[in-house]
């Protein structure tokens, strides 16, 4: 495949951007926006900042993908033993110099997209944006090698995007929003779990102490299942105000998640786990969709 792709061509950059990962970036924003809409209605829903939040999430995800591609290549992590999808720099689809320029462009672009959000969310949005950029780099260069990748996913694919999106719309935070952000981070972390589960032997070889390497195969399998289960159980918070659909619908996701878990346990190792990665990404998007639909249905029924 690498021989058919011209270096630095549009197709090469499309592959480097990893568009399939954008669903994971969209889910936290979807959840934050749906909760804001439920609590404020159409009259108070701000369309422009909603679109900016979504666009910022997309560009930051692409930026993170570029950073990951470049630094893993420089550290020699993407060698001939790699089990996951091939990476642009390692395959020669994109030059390392070109990737550095792309990282700079996407970082600046994310900043320009996020800057207007100060108008709606206040200057604290600057801190949010800076943290997103800083930890985007720290994840690949240091923290993912020290078993902190899962914590960062909980923060930057859960707490930060869900709460920031909601806060921009409503200028406050609620218990339901905070718990929903935690649930979202748990669901998205299943993707990192299966990724590191697949790469556990290679990571051990390269000295990467991911959570999977630290706790072992069996515990990692159980944690993968437990993350999805815990996320759905957190939805109990919606029963008390009578938001039954928001609680019930995500259990459809849990059924899919449980089936994917059984497949993962059967496959155990090798490139065949890439299909579990794809199924997990699908499940994450379905969770976000079900949660959003549940929130909107509750708005209709409660009114």
Where are these regions (language model features)?
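Small-residue-rich segments of transmembrane alpha-helices in multi-pass membrane proteins
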Residues: 26-32, 152-166, 184, 213-217, ...
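Membrane-embedded alpha-helical segments that form the functional core of polytopic membrane enzymes
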Residues: 30, 41-67, 126-137, 176-194
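Multi-pass membrane catalytic core of lipid/isoprenoid biosynthesis enzymes
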Residues: 80-120, 208-243, 281-287
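Topogenic membrane-insertion module of multi-pass membrane proteins
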Residues: 1-52, 56, 146-150
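Functional transmembrane core segments of multi-pass inner-membrane proteins
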Residues: 153-200, 204-206, 218-221
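Acidic (Asp/Glu-rich) catalytic motifs at the cytosolic membrane interface
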Residues: 59-83, 190-212
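Intramembrane alpha-helical segments
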Residues: 85-172
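Extended hydrophobic alpha-helices typical of membrane-associated regions
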Residues: 240-300
């Amino acid at each position: 495949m690498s021989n058919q792709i011209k270096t630095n061509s549009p197709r090469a950059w499309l592959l480097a951007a990893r568009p399939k990962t954008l669903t994971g970036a969209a889910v936290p924003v979807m959840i934050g926006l749906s909760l804001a809409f439920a609590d404020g209605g159409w009259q108070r829903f701000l369309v422009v900042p909603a679109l900016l939040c979504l666009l910022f999430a997309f560009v930051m995800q692409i930026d993170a993908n570029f950073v990951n591609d470049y630094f893993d290549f420089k550290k020699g992590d993407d060698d001939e033993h790699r089990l996951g999808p091939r990476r642009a720099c390692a395959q020669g689809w994109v030059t390392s110099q070109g990737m550095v320029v792309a990282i700079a462009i996407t970082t600046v672009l994310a900043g320009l997209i996020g800057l207007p959000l100060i108008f709606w969310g206040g200057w604290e949005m600057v801190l949010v944006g800076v943290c997103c950029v800083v930890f985007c780099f720290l994840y690949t260069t240091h923290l993912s090698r020290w078993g902190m990748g899962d914590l960062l996913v909980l923060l930057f694919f859960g707490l930060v995007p869900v709460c920031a999106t909601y806060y921009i719309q409503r200028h406050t935070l609620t218990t339901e929003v905070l718990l929903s952000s935690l649930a979202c981070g748990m669901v998205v972390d299943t993707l990192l779990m299966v990724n590191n589960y697949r790469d556990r032997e290679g990571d051990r070889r390269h000295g990467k102490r991911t959570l999977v390497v630290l706790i072992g195969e069996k515990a990692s399998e159980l944690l993968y299942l437990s993350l999805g289960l815990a996320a759905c159980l957190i939805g109990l918070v919606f029963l008390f105000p009578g938001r039954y659909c928001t609680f019930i619908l995500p259990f459809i996701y849990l059924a899919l998640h449980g089936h994917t878990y059984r497949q993962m346990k059967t496959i155990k190792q090798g490139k065949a786990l890439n299909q579990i990665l794809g199924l997990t990404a699908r499940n994450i998007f379905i969770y976000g969709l079900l949660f959003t639909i549940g929130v909107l249905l509750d708005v209709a029924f409660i009114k």
